[in-house]
UniProtKB/Swiss-Prot annotation:
Residues covered by the EF-hand domain: 753-788, 789-824
MF (Gene Ontology): actin filament binding; calcium ion binding; channel activator activity; cytoskeletal protein binding; FATZ binding; identical protein binding; integrin binding; LIM domain binding
Any GO BP annotation: positive regulation of cation channel activity
InterPro entries per the UniProt record, alphabetical: Actinin_actin-bd_CS (IPR001589), CH_dom (IPR001715), CH_dom_sf (IPR036872), EF-hand-dom_pair (IPR011992), EF-hand_Ca_insen (IPR014837), EF_hand_dom (IPR002048), Spectrin/alpha-actinin (IPR018159), Spectrin_repeat (IPR002017)
The protein, known as: Alpha-actinin-2
Disease: Cardiomyopathy, familial hypertrophic, 23, with or without left ventricular non-compaction: A hereditary heart disorder characterized by ventricular hypertrophy, which is usually asymmetric and often involves the interventricular septum. The symptoms include dyspnea, syncope, collapse, palpitations, and chest pain. They can be readily provoked by exercise. The disorder has inter- and intrafamilial variability ranging from benign to malignant forms with high risk of cardiac failure and sudden cardiac death. Cardiomyopathy, dilated, 1AA, with or without left ventricular non-compaction: A disorder characterized by ventricular dilation and impaired systolic function, resulting in congestive heart failure and arrhythmia. Patients are at risk of premature death.
Cellular component GO terms, alphabetical: actin filament; cell junction; cell projection; cortical actin cytoskeleton; cytoskeleton; cytosol; dendritic spine; extracellular exosome
Keyword field: Actin-binding, Calcium, Cardiomyopathy, Cytoplasm, Disease variant, Metal-binding, Phosphoprotein, Repeat, Ubl conjugation
Length: 894
């Protein structure tokens, strides 16, 4: 369903002269149209009856029933609501004329100018005049008051229809005739004001008769608008009667205007009731909020006035936390409620005053002043409660601080003393070495110093416990028990400390003798152990050599190492004798310590194991060195074999490159001789491929043997490959260049002497001897040959010889340019002149002449592509050889 735009209010302005200007000059000839006359008869009759039925009468024939003027006067009284002069009751003609004149005079008194309408014509039953008079009445009493945005009556009615139907699809009201033929406009007007009467979404634009009948039936049944039109007449008439349509549509305007007035009145009542309901809601909300707030204050004040102290800090902290929770969570919403209550009260009083209602008087005890007083009492109780809480917390805090100080000092002492008795009772020194005993003795001295330092803390703990007892601390029993345990433990620690010192000093003297022997062992065992580890590393070292000289050097070093082994064995036996002496002393005095040496991590078992390992590795090293020596001899043979071939192939490739280069720039002899020589070079190069393949095989063997250098040659396989590929590319390119030169020479008609001269000039200015001239070299070459070049001309020439912008000029480009400059080339003009000879000097040529003078295939080619000649003297079948020739050289669009 289409959405309707919000209603718009319009200002109605009426100008009597303007609205009648168009209608006073209505075209009487139009009423002669039978279709229009039929439509107006039906519409005007229905309109008149819609008003006359209010007086209990109606008309059947519009031109007959108004002839005596009685029903005409009655119609005017009904539609105007005013009384007309008393009619004449006679049946004579002059009575009828008098009654009609009274009606016409009344119409004229309303500012309506009646043009060419006389009472005699109405009395005589003149259809045109009667319809014109009724139309004038309709304009004055049904349409005149319709004015939208200072428009005339007709334009105002049209604008009203346009605005009401604007939101609807397929509706475009532009006039009062053709715009209404599909019936959608009438349906849209009904749906806009009474959407319950019609389902607009189900209407079909292709069913105009059905749409019109539906609209008129609904209007007659629900809107009290009689059926004034025939749907078939409207649809089948090319241009329906405008006045009939306007009359019918104006009935919708008046019907819906009354509905809008009723809606406005209902809205005004709803607005007043809504204001009253909102005021009542605010009153109820104020009463509810005031009751809840006062009840909360009543419950809270006794809680704040409770001053019962607690014995512990935790209990007082709980009260303080409850108070803070009250301040953070419970009170802020109530503050907001109190503020909102005052705002609602003031807002309500303002609304009541604006709407002329009596002021609001809350229930007893719920005035704003009552709430403010209760709130003030709450604030006072809250302030005293907070001060009492803080004072109590400060008092308990002082007592708790002293108890916490006792606990901290007691905990610190207990933590320090934990495990100390067990440590002092240990016999760890009985199995310790001299170093460990000395360390234990120093550690014990440090403990004695620490013990003396803790004497003050123990005294402080006892003093604090005494003070807590005097202040009647609630947990004094536990404090006293803890203090007594600390003092008893302190006495035991002093006794155990003295006993441990004496035991440590005795053990120190017993172990000093053994320590000297351990030290001597460590001084000699460490160097010998390092020597054996180094020897094992050297004997197991992975060696990588690339020559016979390198492996021979390793063999010599190994022989020198084997010569030092007898001396090393003597040192080993001396170290073992020292260790045996240590074990003898330990057994003699029954000392329960480990036989391990504190000065060395080396043991005799390690020395024995490593010495055996050294003796096993020596022959293994001998075998590895001999195997590597044999491998290096084999690699040397591969190097010499590869070098012999590479030293022959490398110079051969270089020599061939030089020969090809000399051949490509020579300026003597014919190009064919040069070509034959290059072909011979190519044949020799291809036959030489077997040598390259053999060298590749030797290179493969060298790579498999992991030989990375070769002092016998400067050539690598990569050098040979690059040189060989360059040689193949160079010979192929050079042969192609000579072939191109031969083709150019033959095509351009250049002599061998000219070609040699071009080559000599190019070679002279090819300073880099790479077969290329740069821009400056090319400019110098052209100047030497007599060219007077400006910048623009030289730039043009460069685009010819260097179209890709490479910055260089090849010999072939140079030859192409020189041949264009010197050779006798074909042009479009030359070809046109040749065709003119074949055509016997005619501006056109015939197909028979082409077949007679040219080979068949070329003649057919020309006939197929030559355009028809249409110039002066043209004959049937004439062909335009001039346009064809220009097209061959790109000088036309053919």
């Amino acid at each position: 369903m289409n959405q309707i735009e919000p209603g718009v209010q319009y200002n109605y302005v009426y100008d009597e002269d303007e609205y009648m200007i168009q209608e006073e000059e209505w075209d009487r000839d139009l009423l002669l149209d039978p279709a229009w006359e039929k439509q107006q008869r039906k519409t005007f009759t229905a309109w008149c009856n819609s008003h006359l039925r209010k007086a209990g009468t109606q008309i059947e024939n519009i031109e007959e029933d108004f002839r005596n003027g009685l029903k005409l006067m009655l119609l005017l009284e009904v539609i105007s609501g005013e009384r007309l002069p008393k009619p004449d009751r006679g049946k004579m003609r002059f009575h009828k004329i008098a009654n009609v004149n009274k009606a016409l005079d009344y119409i004229a008194s309303k500012g309506v100018k009646l043009v060419s309408i006389g009472a005699e014509e109405i009395v005589d039953g003149n259809v045109k005049m009667t319809l014109g008079m009724i139309w004038t009445i309709i304009l004055r009493f049904a349409i005149q008051d319709i004015s939208v945005e200072e428009t005339s009556a007709k334009e105002g009615l049209l604008l009203w229809c346009q605005r009401k139907t604007a939101p609807y699809r397929n509706v475009n009201i532009q006039n009062f005739h053709t715009s209404w033929k599909d019936g959608l406009g009438l349906c849209a007007l009904i749906h806009r004001h009474r959407p319950d009467l019609i389902d607009y979404s189900k209407l079909n634009k292709d069913d105009p008769i059905g749409n019109i009948n539906l609209a008129m039936e609904i209007a007659e049944k629900h809107l009290d608008i009689p059926k004034m039109l025939d749907a078939e007449d409207i649809v089948n008439t090319p241009k329906p009667d405008e006045r009939a349509i306007m009359t019918y549509v104006s009935c919708f305007y008046h019907a819906f205007a009354g509905a809008e007035q009723a809606e406005t009145a209902a809205n005004r009542i709803c607005k007043v009731l809504a204001v009253n309901q909102e005021n009542e809601r605010l009153m109820e909300e104020y009463e509810r909020l005031a009751s809840e707030l006062l009840e909360w204050i009543r419950r809270t004040i006794p809680w704040l006035e409770n001053r019962t102290p607690e014995k512990t800090m935790q209990a007082m902290q709980k009260k303080l936390e409850d108070f803070r929770d009250y301040r953070r969570k419970h009170k802020p919403p109530k503050v907001q409620e109190k503020c909102q209550l005052e705002i609602n009260f003031n807002t309500l009083q303002t609304k009541l005053r604006i709407s002329n209602r009596p002021a609001f008087m809350p229930s007893e005890g719920k005035m704003v002043s009552d709430i403010a007083g209760a709130w003030q009492r709450l604030e006072q109780a809250e302030k005293g409660y907070e001060e009492w809480l803080l004072n109590e917390i400060r008092r308990l805090e002082r007592l708790e601080h002293l108890a916490e100080k006792f606990r901290q000092k007691a905990s610190t002492h207990e933590t320090w003393a934990y495990g100390k008795e067990q440590i002092l009772l240990q016999k760890d020194y009985e199995s310790a070495s001299l170093t460990e005993v000395r360390a234990l003795l120093r550690k014990h001295e440090a403990f004695e110093s620490d013990l003396a330092a803790h004497q003050d803390r123990v005294e402080q703990i006892a003093a604090i416990a005494q003070e807590l007892n005097e202040l009647d601390y609630h947990d004094a029993v536990n404090v006293n028990d803890r203090c007594q345990k600390i003092c008893d433990q302190w006495d035991r620690l002093g006794t155990l400390t003295q006993k441990r010192r004496e035991a440590l000093e005795r053990m120190e003297k017993l172990l000093e003798t053994i320590d000297q022997l351990h030290l001597e062992f460590a001084k000699r065992a460490a160097p010998f152990n390092n020597w054996m580890e180094g020897a094992m590393e050297d004997l197991q070292d992975m060696f990588i050599v690339h020559s016979i000289e390198e492996i021979q050097s390793l063999i010599t070093a190994h022989e020198q190492f084997k010569a030092t082994l007898p001396e090393a064995d003597g040192e080993r036996q001396s170290i073992m004798a020292i260790q045996n002496e240590v074990e003898k002393v330990i057994q003699s005095y029954n000392i329960r310590i480990s036989s391990s040496n504190p000065y060395s991590t080396v043991t005799m078992d390690e020395l024995r194991t490593k010495w055996d390992k050294v003796k096993q590795l020596v022959p293994i090293r001998d075998q590895s060195l001999q195997e590597e020596l044999a491998r290096q001899h084999a690699n040397e043979r591969l190097r010499r074999q590869f070098a012999a071939q590479a030293n022959a192939i490398g110079p051969w490739i270089q020599n061939k490159m030089e020969e090809i280069a000399r051949s490509s720039i020579q300026i003597t002899g014919a190009l064919e001789d040069q070509m034959n020589q290059l072909k011979q070079y190519e044949h020799n190069i291809i036959n030489y491929k077997n040598n390259i393949d053999k060298l590749e095989g030797d290179h493969q063997l060298i790579q498999e043997a992991l030989v990375f250098d070769n002092k016998h040659t400067n050539y690598t396989m990569e050098h040979i490959r690059v040189g060989w590929e360059l040689l193949l590319t160079t010979i192929a390119r050079t042969i192609n260049e000579v072939e191109t030169q031969i083709l150019t020479r033959d095509a351009k008609g250049i002599t061998q002497e000219q070609m040699n001269e071009f080559r000599a000039s190019f070679n002279h200015f090819d300073r880099r001897k790479n077969g290329l001239m740069d821009h400056e070299d090319f400019r110098a070459c052209l100047i030497s040959m007599g060219y007077d070049l400006g910048e623009a001309e030289f730039a043009r020439i460069m685009t010819l010889v260097d179209p890709n912008g490479q910055g260089t000029v090849t010999f072939q480009s140079f030859i192409d340019f020189m041949t264009r400059e010197t050779a006798d080339t074909d042009t479009a003009e030359q070809v046109i002149a040749s065709f003119r000879i074949l055509a016997s000097d005619k501006p056109y040529i015939l197909a028979e002449e082409l077949r007679r003078e040219l080979p068949p295939d070329q003649a057919q080619y020309c006939i197929k592509r030559m355009p028809a000649y249409s110039g002066p003297g043209s004959v049937p079948g004439a062909l335009d050889y001039a346009a064809f020739s220009s097209a061959l050289y790109g000088e036309s669009d053919l």
